[in-house]
Amino acid sequence: MLRVIVESATNIPKTKFGKPDPIVSVIFKDEKKKTKKVDNELNPVWNEILEFDLRGIPLDSSSSLVIVVKDFETIGQNKLIGTATVSLKDLIGDQNRSLPYKQTSLLNEKGQDTGATIDLVIGYTPPSAPHPNDPSGTSVPGMGEEEEEDQGDEDRVDGIVRGPGPKGPSGTVSEAQLARRITKGKSSRRMLSNKPQDFQIRVRVIEGRQLCGNNIRPVVKVHICGQTHRTRIKRGNNPFFDELFFYNVHITPSELMDEIISIRVYNSHSLRADCLMGEFKIDVGFVYDEPGHAVMRKWLLLNDPEDTSSGAKGYMKVSMFVLGTGDEPPPEKRDRDNDSDDVESNLLLPAGIALRWVTFMLKIYRAEDIPQMDDAFSQTVKEIFGGNADKKNLVDPFVEVSFAGKKVCTNIIERNANPEWNQVVNLQIKFPSMCEKIKLTVYDWDRLTKNDVVGTTYLYLSKIAASGGEVEATTGETEVGFVPTFGPCYLNLYGSPREYTGFPDPYDELNSGKGEGVAYRGRIFVELNTFLEKKPPEKKLEPISSDDLLVVEKYQRRRKYSLSAVFHSATMLQDVGEAIQFEVSIGNYGNKFDATCKPLASTTQYSRAVFDGNYYYYLPWAHTKPVVTLTSYWEDISHRLDAVNTLLVMAERLQSNIEAVKSGIQGKIPANQLAEVWLKLIDEVIEDTRYTLPVTEGKANVTVLDTQIRKLRSRFLSQIHEAALRMRSEATDVKSTLLEIEEWLDKLMQLTEEPQNSMPDIIIWMIRGEKRLAYARIPAHQVLYSTSGGNASGKYCGKTQTILLKYPQEKTNGPKVPVELRVNIWLGLSAVEKKFNSFAEGTFTVFAEMYENQALVFGKWGTSGLVGRHKFSDVTGKIKLKREFFLPPKGWEWEGDWVVDPERSLLTEADAGHTEFTDEVYQNENRYPGGEWKQAEDTYTDANGDKAASPSEMTCPPGWEWEDDAWIYDINRAVDEKGWEYGITIPPDNKPKSWVAAEKMYHTHRRRRLVRKRKKDLTQTASSTARAMEELEDREGWEYASLIGWKFHWKQRSSDTFRRRRWRRKMAPSETHGAAAIFKLEGALGADTTEDGEEKGPEKQKHSATTVFGANTPIVSCNFDRVYIYHLRCYIYQARNLMALDKDSFSDPYAHVSFLHRSKTTEIIHSTLNPTWDQTIIFDEVEIFGEPQTVLQNPPNVTIELFDNDQVGKDEFLGRSICSPLVKLNSETDITPKLLWHPVMNGDKACGDVLVTAELILRNKDGSNLPILPSQRAPNLYMVPQGIRPVVQLTAIEILAWGLRNMKNYQMASVTSPSLVVECGGERVESVVIKSLKKTPNFPSSVLFMKVFLPKEELYMPPLVIKVIDHRQFGRKPVVGQCTIDHLDRFRCDPYAGKEDIVPQLKASLMSAPPCREVVIEIEDTKPLLASKLSEKEEEIVDWWSKFYASSGEHEKCGQYIQKGYSKLKIYDCELEDVADFEGLTDFSDTFKLYRGKSDENEDPSVVGEFKGSFRIYPLPDDPSVPAPPRQFRELPDSVPQECTVRIYIVQGLQLQPQDNNGLCDPYIKITLGKKVIEDRDHYIPNTLNPVFGRMYELSCYLPQEKDLKISVYDYDTFTRDEKVGETTIDLENRFLSRFGSHCGIPEQYCVSGVNTWRDQLRPTQLLQNVARFKGFPPPVLSEDGSRIRYGGRDYHLDEFEANKILHQHLGAPEERLALHILRTQGLVPEHVETRTLHSTFQPNISQGKLQMWVDVFPKSLGPPGPPFNITPRKAKKYYLRVIIWNTKDVILDEKSITGEDMSDIYVKGWISGSEENKQKTDVHYRSLDGEGNFNWRFVFPFDYLPAEQLCIVAKKEHFWSIDQTEFRVPPRLIIQIWDNDKFSLDDYLGFLELDLHRTIIPAKTSEKCSLDMIPDLKAMDPLKAKTASLFEQRSMKGWWPCYADKDGTRVMAGKVEMTLEVLNEREADERPAGKGRSEPNMNPKLDPPNRPETSFLWFTNPCKTMRFIVWRRFKWVIIGLLLLLILLLFVAVLLYSLPNYLSMKIVRPNA
């Protein structure tokens, strides 16, 4: 960043017309910035800051600035005054530097000195890349909004941005820079779950700065997820809020990330509509992607959403947190020093970027394939009246574009499925935007009802724009970043199935983008461009110009694509019934229910599922595999997808190599082998990243985004390449490189994202009957063939892949898999479709197919009885066909004639797939009521009553043999003893509906069931059975049914009335085409529509191409001539951590193992969650069609489904695991499969692991190449063979069974006499029974021992199972709790190592030792006489809170504490158990939770107790003569209960969850310990989320019975029940027993007095003796003077620890101090405060706030502890601020007098922030004509103040109905306002001044020196910033301060005020009293009435003065003139009046 401060210029030459108006332009590297002009000035002063963003490029020696000074002309060109060039080489360096450039000469055009000079200050900040979320970072601010507003029009960038372009024009480089860091973190956002979860969003509104407006009362409203919170109303332009809002939501993560956080600031004083002052919007996802999911103390730039041309409306400082389940909020560090708070560098913006107005110009051209959305009723009516119906276009689409809360809609185009809008949507936003995606929703407009959503798609800004920051930082590239750009390109829409029904769509949510769309629903053609401009667009919606429409034509060019899918198998079916078929579609092509495309062979034939003999069903396709083909037309985007596939190959290879390295590290393979694996990884990365991506040049449809993405990818690949080369040469440790290598993988995965992928996904549907059942979506690029070669083709192109279909809206695969498909898909351009031949396996055959139908009429078969059927039809019988009209398409020719070819797959018998079967037949008799039973007319029937053959006629089918000798009656039913069941018919039925077992007189029918079992004849081969079956079939190929539409069967029955047979004619491809000829079949075969002309149009349309079954498309299949026989062995050894699904806390697991069309079941293992099957499942003679090499590359998966066996009811699903077998094509291959743990998944939840592997062997004909069979444990139950099963070793397991805790009742009775059973590896050991759990919860003998054969490899280690058995009456021993421990490696130990780590330490063991003689701490009385007085004085200055604040870094609150040398404590921001150094305080014994009962699907199992104990595992020698290793658990403490004193110190709460409607809480503490409860309700703290409790509680308890200390925070409510905020539980037993001394933290110093008095029971020397004894060291030896101790073989000196430290008077004896220093080196828990998270059952895994506290535990057997700490909160002190308003000057003259003079009636108002109700104001200085006012008026403001924290305490009721006062802590600020008094209207506000009393602006001595420059600006680097001082330190100030007002966004001087400010404490105020105003006591100082001019008066109260000072002064000469004129007029009048008399008298009496 380069900052130029243009200060002033001198001696500017005059112009011809007078003084110039100078303006300065500063030019740096083609970028120009200007100052404002100064009118009519030869020595102008600008004092303006111009900033230049260096774009990451540091200055070099050639860098310079050009300064141009011109004379501003309103009209015409500015005239040059002078120029100067300033070299910047003196600023170069790594540090921030600022240099003055004074008296720089200005030169004219000829280079001559003009005599004028200019003064500059230039500051330089070198480019750096701190984290943008670090408030303390030195991130460089960009060009601010104000500066941007001042640019001239000539510098504005209005051009369209199509990428960075070359350097040159001003602004082009900055366009790329503008997009920097937009993609920060977002593109790497993890895949988000669609399962609703609990989230908590927290927003802390801290303060505002420079809010616009005068005399404002701002309030902030925060709106998220439909919830709104608002702050309290404040006053002033810089309000301080510090309010925290909580938003609890239950929503899916994907939806939450799109929610907007809206922060708006309103002026509550305004009643007008324009009270919105500014807003800021950001999406939740942006915050979630920040480190810690939080934005900490960042400034937001507010702007006016309506007026886009306006500048910044102020700043708001906030913190935002988004907490998911289990997330902990990061600690928020408060910053008290606002001087360091540089707003610009701490804006919530990417580093170095200014917000700029940009316009997103989104061009929406057209859409296609929009599905029907409206009912066809109106079209049907039109059709009836002879109109033309248009059912294809039953949709009225329009597009809604939404971004950052703004929405714009296009026009509605009625009845058009392919609309053309050709409109531009203009969205103007601030950029870079905090919102992530532009949402485009296509709606169907409805006149009467709500508009329906057709589909939704998004444009992600992070994917269509790039910062390039990471690349530029390392390569110096400046043009890798680019602003958002997209297309022209199609965006695909996905959602619910396209088929329209009049009913509500169950999958409607999918259309709104919630969940994965299951069907293609059209696409829209759009283009996005970004303009950088300040002026808003004239219209939000306008038409696209015709020129633009022509330009985008080339982007819509289509090419023909061919797709082939060969279905190899469909297995694992469970829901069987109707026949099944599969449909493949891409876009609309292939959708069999859609009539908009040509008919395609896109569906397989219907097939019926066959039982696999064990559990599942499969489709019997055998060697004839169904094939679907379709052709489609799409844009050729191979240049995009080739790059994606190539990058995916790189990423997958790197992923597999990373996993190989990780498994090597986990398996602890030798270092040289690990290095080989690692080198292979690095070498492959180097090789892969050399690859150049496909070139885009020359392609017609290349967009700007294509070019930019290619450039970005190339730079990233080269970056990874260089990093890999560097790592290969420099790396020394494999583990340390993994983090960087995984970052490479993340980068590669980001690069694979292709936003312009316009090719729709391939969708496979399973259709049963006519209903879509399950689907799979396959991205087209995965199967796309590329002509580029290499890895550009898709991963599965032409390869067989396994796909698990899923049900719509099922987020993950559930208990049932609809079907497992193995399918081979090839997709490619039709131009290269012959390349398909090289991928094709087998022989492709195509058949034309039709069915001949006949009915039985009068005993003869014929066509006359075919009601509604045709003689020849399709398979449904509904579409009429005729063989003469079948023509082979191009590339195909007939091969042979029409032949009868029966379809066997649809006619499977009930016994198909079974090895055992029971035939049944019913014997029927009837009678008249009361008569004799006689044979019925149909003597033998089936179960439905239909006629059947008699038992004597029924023969055993070929391949079967009878198991029973004869037919027997079935009496295992609800029948009588002879097997009869009885019924009665109710007309019109002729058969009974129900049957009963007892005969009644009214029964008229009875029947009994005859059964006979048969089984497969294993001696016969499948081929001989098939031949025999063919002989049974009808020779003519007929299949029969009882009625039309019923199920067909082979053998004719007497009840059959309908038959059909299939005719087929084969087509073969011509030699030139090969297998690719199958793509020529589009719309090839048609139905006969020439006959039956009476069929109307609608009927024809009904039978059109794709209705019902698409029967007129050809049947394509792939025939495999050769079948390969394989042999599969699946070795399933064991499982672990399965779900408990039985009430006894266990399961009875077994597994179905499925491979292709075969499956088998393991044995059932009862009552375990960790079954060991040790079983080999063998599938012999598995038929697989296709080349063995294909099977080797993509072998079929082995699927293992685990179930819990239940005696009653259905077996419950436990989970599914998939394993890929090792393929052996050559028996000589010497590779042994390795057992591996595979996860067991139930949906998306991991439910255990199974240890399994499998091998697939290509079998010889005689099977001679197969390995020998493993040994059998039982008949047909093979074990896992040696060499594959784990190698075991004799191992010792020592169990420390300490005790049981918190056992819950079992079957409503308490657990009283439990024992412990430990099982591992088939061995079992049981503990002694605890006689009374309530009295002694510990086991009497604590150590158990067992010898087990455990695997040597850690990977195969079985879990260890703990069971608790309760010994009850009558010999019952139920399992009342169990626990499985997986990872046993943490318990392994070396039995010969020292005993240091295996015995507990400190007090627990001390209790079992003889008691210490000295337990009383003797303190020598060495205090001076005045010690008590001194300590009292010190206590005022130093308290425990001083220690706390000194330790937390808040030094301004701790006074002189640090300077006095006192000790600090450790503040942990987590629980003490979570501190890594203390191992969870489980070093003596772990706590294992015990579980019981059935696991619910979505709930964790219930905890029913705890086991306290530990384990030690070590190998035993194989030779029994070798002595066994020493036992590990020795010297155990006594396990009897101990009585203890517990002190709980609660310091403060942090960010508590609000419980009241006002968003606050009234918290108090509740403590529960055993049966003791302390409810501190009386000391609740009202209305706060951050309460300072400062409370200490002391209780006594017995350990371990009362080990759980529960600390709860409750919300006090007066009238309703108190609500729990949250609670935390501390295990006191762990703290008591831990070797880390966690019972009482060790302080830094040993003090015998003062605030840090020693509080432990034992002195440091005693503690050190105990530590030495437990560690096996000799006792410590103390020197005589106590300054040296010998401990652990080393001498410790006191001087070592206390050198250069301040020693105060409270320290104890030297030997104790030295012992304490040694103790602090032993890793013990220090004196501390821990921060514990509060949890609630309402949101169990989300923090409800935190509690800072600690606990001390003292056993009473060791005597009384020391005195407790006093942590009572500090009390505020009373202070007074006295403000004397002396005078004002230069106040704005706001009024005009009646005589037209400018004047103001001035008065001054003032208050302290937070105490607005205590406003005070002066009297009025009337009629100030020059802005001067005289007052001599005193304000006195009392306030409560905390000197240590430098905050005011304000306590007041929020509402008049509030019960409690709310306490606020606000900075002490004085607000002074100048007002103009009006008698008959509202007073006018003139200006204000805000003074922070801690940083008070030092006033000017005279009014002339007082200016606005004294007011500090927001920029921390501003060198003109005014000096400030603390009024609390200076005590008083006097001088002139400026007041200002806001006018059009800028500050203007409103006046100057002369004041005296004085701060006094209460004592000083009493000593020096003073009254308010000039009232008594008027002293200190005495204020005399102001000597105001005589003109100062209120005019209507002083008429004389009004005449004298207003009338006389203004109109004096007028009055005098008028008087003289009046006298003159009177004189003339008198003269005229007297003259005639006088003249007549003179005439009459001349001498008179």
Swiss-Prot record:
MF GO annotations: metal ion binding; phospholipid binding
Annotated protein name in UniProt: Myoferlin
Cofactor details (free text): Binds Ca(2+). The ions are bound to the C2 1 domain.
Residues holding Ca(2+) 1: D390, D396, D444, D446
Broad class of the protein's primary localization: membrane
Residues the record lists as binding Ca(2+) 5: D1878, S1881, D1884
Binding-site residues, Ca(2+) 2: D390, D444, D446, D452
Modified residues (N6-acetyllysine): K540, K871, K1494
Record membrane topology: Single-pass type II membrane protein
Compartment(s) of residence: Cell membrane; Nucleus membrane; Cytoplasmic vesicle membrane
Function, as annotated: Calcium/phospholipid-binding protein that plays a role in the plasmalemma repair mechanism of endothelial cells that permits rapid resealing of membranes disrupted by mechanical stress. Involved in endocytic recycling. Implicated in VEGF signal transduction by regulating the levels of the receptor KDR.
CDD domains in the record: C2A_Ferlin, C2B_Ferlin, C2C_Ferlin, C2D_Ferlin, C2E_Ferlin, C2F_Ferlin
Cellular component terms per the entry's GO annotation: caveola; cytoplasmic vesicle membrane; nuclear membrane
Other remarks in the entry: Mice lacking Myof display fewer large multinucleated myotubes and are impaired in their ability to regenerate skeletal muscle after injury. They display a defective membrane repair in endothelial cells. They show also a delayed endocytic recycling.
Gene Ontology BP terms: cellular response to heat; glycerol metabolic process; muscle cell development; plasma membrane repair; regulation of vascular endothelial growth factor receptor signaling pathway; T-tubule organization
Compositionally biased residues, Acidic residues: 144-156
Residue sites binding Ca(2+) 3 per the record: D1142, D1148, D1204, D1206
Residues binding Ca(2+) 4, per UniProt: D1556, D1562, D1611, D1613
Bilayer-crossing regions: 2013-2033
Superkingdom of source: Eukaryota
Subunit (UniProt): Interacts with EHD1. Interacts with EHD2; the interaction is direct. Interacts with DNM2 and KDR. Interacts with RIPOR2.
Region: Disordered, residue numbers: 124-176, 1964-1986
Domain C2: 1-101, 183-300, 339-475, 1110-1238, 1269-1397, 1523-1641, 1759-1907
Family, per entry: Belongs to the ferlin family.
Record comment regarding domains: The C2 1 domain associates with lipid membranes in a calcium-dependent manner.
Cytoplasmic face residues: 1-2012
